[in-house]
């Protein structure tokens, strides 16, 4: 069974919440699923996510906790807390994620099968703010929920696709010297 990674973008005002599922297959993160929720209660989203996890068996899910705070973490069921990782989408983090998505895509390490999601990826525009900062945004009147869900899923799976494991604290037994 190939590792699976999820990215969950939580709605705040008028947006939808979205989940993108990526599967690591022969070094490529392939989109194998997605779900979009109309603006509904976060508790229903996390209940649905737990059911989806029963089918998909996620290795990790990165979710956007920007603006929703720690209250959302309390809605995640205890078994799901082991695989759910909160990400605060600051301007710097958004640049990192956009760079990651574009890098994986250019390296042919990311495969997107959904036409609408692909459109959301290509719609991202670079603009300069009044203060001279570079910003990414999507065209007015369009949603970018699935794009950020994809970016978060790439974040969750990036270590696996690059063959790098995240450092973990493990108890090691002493080596025997011969």
Task: Put a short name on every predicted segment.
Residues 1-89, 95, 99, 103, ...:
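RNase H-like, metal-dependent nuclease domains and their acidic two-metal-ion catalytic environment used
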């Amino acid at each position: 069974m190939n590792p699976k990674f999820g990215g969950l973008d939580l709605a705040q005002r008028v947006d939808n919440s979205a989940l993108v599922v990526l599967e690591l297959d022969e070094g490529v993160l392939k989109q194998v699923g997605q779900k979009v929720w109309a603006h509904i209660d976060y508790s229903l989203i996390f209940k649905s996510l737990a059911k989806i996890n029963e089918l998909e068996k996620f290795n990790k899910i990165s979710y956007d906790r920007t603006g929703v705070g720690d209250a959302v973490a309390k809605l995640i069921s205890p078994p799901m807390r082991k695989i759910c990782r909160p990400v605060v989408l600051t301007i710097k983090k958004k640049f990192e994620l956009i760079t990651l998505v574009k890098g994986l895509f250019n390296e042919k390490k990311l495969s997107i099968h959904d036409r609408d999601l692909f459109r959301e990826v290509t719609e991202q525009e670079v603009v300069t703010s009044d203060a001279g900062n570079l910003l990414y945004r999507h065209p007015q009147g369009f949603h970018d929920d699935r794009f950020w869900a994809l970016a978060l899923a790439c974040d969750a799976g990036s270590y696996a696709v690059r063959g790098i494991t995240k450092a973990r604290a493990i108890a090691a037994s002493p080596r025997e010297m011969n």
